[in-house]
Amino acid sequence: MKAVPLDLKEANDYVSRLHRHHAPVYRDKFRIGCQDDEGNLCGVAQVGRPVNRIMDDGKTLEVVRLCTDGTPNACSFLYSRCARVAKELGYSRIVTYILESEDGASLKASGWKQDKTSVGGGSWNCPSRPRDVIDRQISMFGETKKYPTEKKKRFCKEL
């Protein structure tokens, strides 16, 4: 596997096609692509400022999107690269959120730890910030909810 640079449009196109439950992001700090041994793009990760305002302390970044085509070890590879780049940029911590139904094996394999702090979940749709709620989307993993409303787990890595 090899890390490759991507521009925002390339990363968002990939996320738009393959992410199971999120739309592309509007902006990020950096993004990394993952190529398999044949040179095919098999995953992307996008890293930005933390969505949680309390965590946005200037020393923390968040993996806001990570999406692969199912290539083995691509997720772990991308999480590791994101942490490495964030450290080189001078950040002291990197975080990400996964659904409660996901086990976090790729994060654990990359040295990330689950935060003991309880985090929320549910719908982000509210009168002051309405979301386009799409009940279902078809993906390579079958039909899934576009915006899952289950609880989230936060994983962190101290850099």
Model segments located where?
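Short beta-strand micro-motifs in enzyme catalytic cores
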Residues: 30-32, 59, 151-155
